[in-house]
Amino acid sequence: MINIEDISKSSNQSEEKQLKSTSSKPKYSFAAKSLFKGSNNITPYYLSTSNTFQCVASESIQTWLLSDDGHIFTSSGNFVLDVSSGGYFVELVQLNSNSKTQIWTIDTTNNKIQNQGNGKYLDIDNLNICVAPLNGNATQQWTTFRRAPIPTGNWGYFQSKQMDSNNNYWGLSVLNNSKSYNTSVVMNKVQAKSKGQIWQMTNDGHILSRLDGSLVLDIGPSINGSTTNYYLDTNVYKANDLKQQWGINENNQIFNQYYPNLCIGFVGELGVDSTVNCVLAQPSSASDINFQWITNPTYSLNEIVSEVPEPFPAYTSGDLLASYQYLSNIATSNFTDDIRSLYTGINVSLQSFLSIVTNATCPSSIHSTEDFSNVQNQIKTELIYAIDVRLVFENYSGFYSKLFSQGSSNLTNLANLINVDMSSNQMVNANYTDAITSVFYSLISEIPVGGSIIANIGQSAVEWGELISQSNYQGASTYQVELSQLYSHLNTNYENEMANAQSMKDTILQDWGMMSKTYALCFLPTNDPSSLNINGLNFEKISDVASVAYEIAMIQMLLPTTYQIYFTPAGYWVPYSDGDFAYSDNSGTYIMATIEYSNSYPPKELTDKLWNNGVSKQEFFWSAYGWNLATSLTYYNMANKFGNIYKLAFPTIKNFTGVPMQFVMTNDGDNLCNFPVKTHFAKFFSIYYSCGDLGHHYFDIAVNDINDNKVANFTVDINLEAIEGSYVSIKTGSLVVQPGYAVGNPICNQGSYSLMFSASILIPIYKSE
């Protein structure tokens, strides 16, 4: 039996330690999978924060933090696992360091999780989590990993394991890249710049399309009236609809939560039939390749470092130990008799070590030539593996260093172009992790073959950084920073991410199982989503795509300090309806101009950096995905009631999460309007209302998610001054944010009396693990 702390060690040896009585501190991230397979003998179940075993492959609700004194925390660190007052079911409660029922012991040898308060074992009762006396059933058996196996919240492809006759991968695709609901989902060859092939699995198991913030994978019509065969299509994101929720089992099948025995597959021959429809049906077997899927990127390194550590073959005595020490000494010129300790060394040549070990002969002091040969062959193999693993990370570090160097040199130029004072104390939202993730998205979107290799390494390093940040390691910081500190902020985060990659590499190089599995990935075909084979990659193209994506991310940070969007509803006059700084749709016209002057537009050099590099005008002007510009309601040359628009302020809620939200604004109890907010989109409150006389006016805003769970509450303070545009801010002390969410720096822009536009305020909401 091992103490919880030992799960993080690079050893599979077990030991028993006395639990401490001090207050706990979260240290290590883990996930626990039950060996119970469910009624279909396929579905894996993971310990979940919902108090029910959910088979959704979701990271946050199935990731826990293990403290060194035996507490099991939720991933947010807000609650711990406890036994209910009835002594049977478990529940999530606040930490009580005096309660022994909040202390658990994980026995990795016998796959058990035991409660120290009552001695019972974690169990399953009708898919509810409970504790029971030892019974030998599979429901009491658990395997633990360093984190849940499928990262959620990242964009990528779902590719079939079945390739066509030309060895091309095909993936889930929205027919004709249509944003319309009830559009068929079919198989298409994976190709660049096809948003209809890019998806994101959310924390609750929805599969969200990159085409639109409310478009998800859904069950379509029945095939010939069958109750076990359905087509797939897209639909609007719905609350608590199991037909829209999915999971990935250990057979790489994507199953439906409402029909857990049915999985996604396809009918037809890839590359031959004109249309190959995706279906929801019963696989013929667990190995039916038409029902097996690969995520791209696979985050293969994330999976490897999540596995139970496997130590190197041990040489502890006799000629085996003598052979190991002899080879270590001659290879390192007597620097050390433990050559494995240098696999992570920066200033050592493993290639030189390999040459010496390969040419070594058994000395007379070692009697067993067989033992010497066995050790020699093992160390040769380890060195070969270590050399290739190091090369992969060296290439990634070179790519990442070049990316940051170019981005840093461009930052000053961008600041001048956007007219930003980089010495000011103005706050900006600078989510570095999102910026880097957007680079990986661009790589897989524009270079599906090759770009995924960089994303596999980079995103796994991000995940690794989040994992080890629980052990007081400094991960990437996010959200708010002063402009004067932006460069330092970016540099610190760059160094942290480089350190994350270095730490992950060192962990792999000190573990025989991880090293072996990583080495194997280096020889997969380049188009394999799990591949780390860098031979033949077009690094120039990869660098160009990444550089543009990073520059766009920097623009997203800087632009809201100088510019905002001016929206005029359809039917009213506007100075421009299209062009470099304008966009129109059925709702009205959006114009980008400076915060102070609605008639001062951005230079063409700036807009060229947007539209010439593939930025979607709709996403930009709607503040979707990485864009977060505040929006002012504007009526040009109006003398009627709209001429008082400068007295008002209109809020925009930006949803950076994978769950739809809604917000309502009220004034003295009167509901002004409810607005839905799509995932990764912003929603602008565009209803005209009456504000009143000079002075402060307060409007309450409540934000809930689609399941009506509270997200945030705050009060908007609108201050009217004589012959001035209104001032807007969040009332001090009014902001309340629920656990699991974070609110970034609100963007507050004053209205204008002379130019007749309203004040604007954008409130960004992020998911916080």
Swiss-Prot record:
One Gene Ontology term of the molecular function aspect: carbohydrate binding
Induction (free text): Induced by high levels of extracellular Ca(2+).
Domain Ricin B-type lectin: 25-145, 158-296
One of the GO BP terms on file: sorocarp development
Subcellular location: Cytoplasm; Membrane
Membrane topology: Peripheral membrane protein
A Gene Ontology term for the protein's cellular component: membrane
PROSITE patterns for the chain: RICIN_B_LECTIN
Keywords noted in UniProt: Cytoplasm, Lectin, Membrane, Repeat
Gene3D superfamilies in UniProt: 2.80.10.50
Chain spans, region Disordered: 1-22
Main location: cytoplasm
Family per record: Belongs to the cup family.
Its biological purpose: May play an important role in stabilizing and/or regulating the cell membrane during Ca(2+) stress or certain stages of development.
Protein name per UniProt: Calcium up-regulated protein B
Organism (species): Dictyostelium discoideum
Gene: cupB
